[in-house]
């Protein structure tokens, strides 16, 4: 199975979700000056920002990570967290990234997710990678 790459703000909601998920994952650093580069296809798990507005939904660190052409080329799908209080903007970062990068928006969950979200993502990620061509 290929990896997960995720970003978690200082609230650590996404970090807690990843810990409960129990799958291999690499974190995009909170410090914007630190950079990482991935070497295999991955699914991105990202929180949504901006309080429901149309701009600012994708964290700056994630934008910087995806602006690296090498990292962007290996992106295969996106999972977003958000807050249902923001209505239609719930999980908007996933929609933005999926549209701009041409990858599927696989799932969204609220805040740090429920046990059901953990099970759905674990199963969905496994099935997603099984359907991918070996050299994808």
Curated annotation (Swiss-Prot):
Gene Ontology molecular function terms on file: FMN binding
Sequence similarity: Belongs to the NrdI family.
Organism expressing this protein natively: Escherichia coli O7:K1 (strain IAI39 / ExPEC)
Biological function: Probably involved in ribonucleotide reductase function.
Domain of life of the source: Bacteria
Name used for this protein in its record: Protein NrdI
BP GO terms, sorted: protein modification process
């Amino acid at each position: 199975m290929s990896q997960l790459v995720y970003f978690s703000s200082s609230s650590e909601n996404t970090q807690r979700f990843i810990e409960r998920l129990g799958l291999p994952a690499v974190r995009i650093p909170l410090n914007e000056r630190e950079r990482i580069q991935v070497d295999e296809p991955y699914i991105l798990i990202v929180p949504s920002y901006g309080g429901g507005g149309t701009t600012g939904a994708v964290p700056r660190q994630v934008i910087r990570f995806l602006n690296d052409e090498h990292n962007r080329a290996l992106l295969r799908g996106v999972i977003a967290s958000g807050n249902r209080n923001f209505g239609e903007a719930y999980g908007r970062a996933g929609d933005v990234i999926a549209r701009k990068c041409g990858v599927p928006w696989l799932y969204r969950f609220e805040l740090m997710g429920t046990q059901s979200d953990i099970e759905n993502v674990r199963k969905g990620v496994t099935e997603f990678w099984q359907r991918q061509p070996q050299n994808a």
